């Protein structure tokens, strides 16, 4: 089934992929991504592990109603979270060689 040394090479490749995956996970956890709403009037910066680092609110919004501001903050956070997911997919594809995963399955398993 496997040629001479084939299984050893396969195991070596799997270990290398696992090492790259671990480094990539650390890189993703430490990256920062900024999401925006209200044409940039509200910005939320989060890490790759979805911890909020910073919330920036344009002063012009301080006079508007509280409910609208809350909606803009939520929208900015959701935008940042979406950007983290997109970045994770792109970076993981570079490690997995574009290997497609079943729907709903995320790496790491």
Swiss-Prot record:
<feature type="region of interest" description="Disordered">
    <location>
        <begin position="88"/>
        <end position="109"/>
    </location>
</feature>
<keyword id="KW-0963">Cytoplasm</keyword>
<dbReference type="InterPro" id="IPR004401">
    <property type="entry name" value="YbaB/EbfC"/>
</dbReference>
<dbReference type="GO" id="GO:0005829">
    <property type="term" value="C:cytosol"/>
</dbReference>
<protein>
    <recommendedName>
        <fullName>Nucleoid-associated protein VIBHAR_03086</fullName>
    </recommendedName>
</protein>
<comment type="subunit">
    <text>Homodimer.</text>
</comment>
<dbReference type="InterPro" id="IPR036894">
    <property type="entry name" value="YbaB-like_sf"/>
</dbReference>
<comment type="similarity">
    <text>Belongs to the YbaB/EbfC family.</text>
</comment>
<feature type="region of interest" description="Disordered">
    <location>
        <begin position="1"/>
        <end position="21"/>
    </location>
</feature>
<keyword id="KW-0238">DNA-binding</keyword>
<dbReference type="GO" id="GO:0003677">
    <property type="term" value="F:DNA binding"/>
</dbReference>
<dbReference type="Pfam" id="PF02575">
    <property type="entry name" value="YbaB_DNA_bd"/>
</dbReference>
<dbReference type="GO" id="GO:0043590">
    <property type="term" value="C:bacterial nucleoid"/>
</dbReference>
<comment type="function">
    <text>Binds to DNA and alters its conformation. May be involved in regulation of gene expression, nucleoid organization and DNA protection.</text>
</comment>
């Amino acid at each position: 089934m496997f040629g001479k040394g084939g299984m050893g090479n396969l195991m070596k490749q799997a270990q290398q992929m696992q090492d790259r995956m671990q480094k990539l996970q650390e890189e993703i956890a430490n990256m920062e991504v900024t999401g925006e709403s209200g044409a940039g009037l509200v910005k939320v910066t989060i890490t790759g592990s979805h911890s909020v680092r910073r919330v920036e609110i344009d002063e012009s919004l301080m006079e508007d109603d509280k409910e609208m501001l809350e909606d803009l903050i939520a929208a900015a956070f959701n935008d940042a979270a979406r950007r983290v997911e997109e970045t994770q997919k792109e970076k993981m594809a570079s490690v997995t060689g574009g290997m497609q995963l079943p729907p709903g399955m995320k790496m790491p398993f």
